[in-house]
């Protein structure tokens, strides 16, 4: 059993990062997992240190977007091929010329493309599930979510079993400052409706989502949390933002607020003189996306469709947020010792623009997602890894 797992679990979230050379704690992971008393919780066990993992403790940023399709980035020659895109289904509100879609997609991700140029792009990376909750559970546990009874978003919102070891617990046990910013979606939750006169078409506006205490991020390995517990949140005026256990007001556009929080984490780790592990989970470009982004993002796009412009602007807001974070890392002298793993929770949604859509359709685009790893090893730029990877054991 262990031999078979070793061959397939190269693809777990932790092993993917290990392959990037980061796990200073790898030799101790199996002992940590035993504390959970679950015999099947083997995703973090049986790893040994490498020459890179024993050199020190690099900072780690695990950065996710929400419903970003593989085709949103030019991962291979077919990503932005007009002939490939001609017969793709697109709902009327997002129908724009293929050339305009390609141009907008390219303009929306310059920073992410630079990370890809600097690191490794995984052209055959698959998520563990086609929807958010189970997929994120795989990120945190390194295990197929079916192993612990999570088959849907509804299951995830009943809470990931407390017997499961979460990735940040291992970092925390080995001296890391750990922080989660953005979307959580792994707690047992309760929803309290907001007054009817404040409800909107965006269902995320219509209730405040609370997490049960045991499933709070601070009880799953994170020293600090700022974000939301549900499947999504409004881009403006969210009623469901929390800093640790206290509700906090929304401040402007949600992507900017999450970026500001992430920069605060980076600065705090420097002040504490600790290595850090940051899980930064943006909600963009999750729908509905009816409201335009701030002008510095929105003005970049003029596809002929307001909804398509809103979509691309939300992606660009994250891209520029990542740029700000990278600049802060460089300013603080942390950049050269920071590993960045970028991905999406699942593929693009049906109700979205080209280049790629397909989440919840059972198509390949629901399961294959962008993976980029910017790490400390001396690897050639534009290196592509075509071996199949998945965030959960099979």
Predicted regions: what they are:
Residues 30-394:
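Formylglycine-dependent sulfatase
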